[in-house]
Amino acid sequence: MGYIMDLRKVVGSRPLLMAGANVILLDSQKRVLLQLRKDNNTWGLPGGSLELGENLEEVAKRELKEETGLTALKLEFFNIFSGKEFYYKYPHGDEVYNVIATYICTEYSGVFEKEESEVQDLRFFSFNELPSEISPPELPIIISFKDALFN
């Protein structure tokens, strides 16, 4: 998150537009991989913010690898999410309005290797047994995908 951290040095905690990507990674049982984040103690999808010169698919692949140890062999674009429901205020006070490109991944390789500085736990969940503590800006994404999957 170098670019955003550099901006924070100039603008402080004021709201920023933060473009990024995340990944709905599904196992063979159609369970979704979620990570328990250390910064806000909520579950969410692997993902992060765009760095200078990256495209959104590159962000999705990079963040998946960094946070989980898994390599996406194929990504399928799902949707772009933005708007007031994607506003988030981090526990330390930084505010963002997220613009998130979400990708689906069912083909991947590697073994779990969580990024110790950001991730407490990695776990697959069935869509009928999702944890209650999901990161607020990611909940609408997960619900949207669940609705598309089961309708």
Residue positions per predicted region:
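A short coil-to-beta-strand element that immediately follows conserved catalytic motifs
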Residues: 71-81
